[in-house]
Each structure stands twice: as C-alpha cells, then as structure tokens.
C-alpha cells in the first residue's frame, strides 16, 4: 500500500529547493532524528513538498528509497559531479549525521515564487520532516486543484 506524504523541504545551509527540483530529490539530515523519517519513504509513495514560508512547491513519486548523499546518483553519475547551488549538502557525509536523499520523479513542481498556499484555510503544514496526508482532505483537495493532479490516478499508475 503506497502512501501520500507531506515532506518538508527544510531549506538551510545544507539544502535548497532549487537543487531538489532540478535534480529530482528531497533530503534530510544533519542528525538521525531528521534523516530517519525520510528513510521510511518507499518506492511508489507520493509526496507533496512544502517550503516553509512559501507553501507547497511540488508533487512527486518516490523512485528509490533514500540513500546517503555520497551514494546518490543521477543517471549513473554521483550527485557531486553536478553543479549544485548548495554544495554544503556533503557536510557530515561520512558519519551518522549525513544527509539522506530520496529520489523522486516530479509530477508537477513550481519555483518558490509560485508556491501554492492559501492563508487561514486550515491547510496542513508542520515542522516535521514527513507526515501522512491521509486524513488531510482539505489539503489533498487543494493540492489536486492547484497542481492539476488526481491522487487516485497517481496511485493506479
């Protein structure tokens, strides 16, 4: 059974939405309490990426379970071979605080200035790295409308 999840982009010194969007991943790390949740995502799960202070910026399907940043590849090439806006993603790459990256196929994504949000409308957001959207009907309907997608169809593919 595939899940539908909220995932916090968690921008900071180690990651940025632009890299996540361009290279097809979401990441978490710098302590196991942050990386552990993203490591529970399974192939086929659908995620809605949330960028704090902006709103929802993408909906994607997990294509592979999360791996340590040193092992993450795009088209067979290690991530470090690409020109990242946020190369600090490699901080602590060799210890338990490593970033873990889950690879995604972005179904729909937008840049930060076009993030989807409606104030005072009870849309789900959280400080958590990952949370289920299963009982967040209002947010699911908002995402379907704003990103012009149908979650039921995404799960039948």
Indicate where each model-derived feature is located.
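Contiguous surface segments at macromolecular interaction interfaces
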Residues: 1-8, 12, 33, 71-157
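Beta-sheet entry/capping signal
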Residues: 4, 45-48, 59
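Short, basic/aromatic beta-hairpin or loop at an interaction surface
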Residues: 11-28
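Short alpha-helix capping/helix-loop boundary micro-motifs
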Residues: 27-37
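Short coil-to-beta transition motif at edge beta-strands of beta-rich domains
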Residues: 36-51
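Intrinsically disordered, low-complexity regulatory regions enriched in Ser/Pro/Gly/Thr
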Residues: 40-42, 54, 95-97
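Beta-strand cores of modular interaction/reader domains in eukaryotic scaffold and signaling proteins
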Residues: 48, 61, 103-105
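Short beta-strand-centered aromatic/proline hotspots
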Residues: 56-67
